[in-house]
């Protein structure tokens, strides 16, 4: 009987974790460049409790991490000079949290020194790893699809786009940023385009996520009912043994 309760508890734990992830997806449905996440689970075989008829394999549900769907989000027009969207697989490079970080959130601006930065103030890096400085005296800023930043006839820099060989090596690092978890540096991107005056919306589909919430609730209730039935069987068995004795 105990095995069934342990299996049920393990499933409830993963359902709670999945609920947190789905709720976070919904909360970020309007976050620029956000990528939808899903829970990864696996079954783990454990040593079972002894029963009257001997031992039998028992498998528990285990949380193994979070998978992100990096498919392209919809492009929305803003008209902002410093709003940039990536069409294709690539990431902007920024200097944050003590190192180089990566993002799809192109809501950029300039700080008082004229440096191109994120909404959190992290400098946006060019293809050489340097900062990009805008001089307001040189006129409007133009960003080409190839990432070249110009003011009139003057080339200011080129926004660096990179991507890792394996997207699963990117881990969240706050402020809509990712960090590289390996010693292999992400490679420059040549087949993606930058669109000025546009932003990439989240790829979250709210209807799908709400449906998941309903399914999680039903699954949780089903597991709870199974555990209640198991506990009731245990109580009945104890009562019968008491009467026999």
Swiss-Prot record:
Q: Where in the cell is it found?
A: Bacterial flagellum basal body
Q: Name one GO biological process term.
A: bacterial-type flagellum-dependent swarming motility
What does the annotation say about its assembly with partners?
A: The basal body constitutes a major portion of the flagellar organelle and consists of five rings (E,L,P,S, and M) mounted on a central rod. The rod consists of about 26 subunits of FlgG in the distal portion, and FlgB, FlgC and FlgF are thought to build up the proximal portion of the rod with about 6 subunits each.
Superkingdom of the source? Answer: Bacteria
Q: What is this protein called?
A: Flagellar basal-body rod protein FlgF
Can you list the GO cellular component terms from the UniProt entry?
bacterial-type flagellum basal body, rod
Which key words are in the record? Bacterial flagellum
Q: What family does the database annotate?
A: Belongs to the flagella basal body rod proteins family.
InterPro entries with a match to the protein in the record = Flag_bb_rod_N (IPR001444), Flagellar_basal_body_rod_CS (IPR019776), Flagellar_FlgE/F/G (IPR020013), Flg_bb/hook_C_dom (IPR010930), FlgE/F/G-like (IPR037925), FlgF (IPR012836), LlgE_F_G-like_D1 (IPR053967)
Task: Supply the source organism for this entry.
Answer: Caulobacter vibrioides (strain ATCC 19089 / CIP 103742 / CB 15) (Caulobacter crescentus)
Regions annotated as coiled coil: none
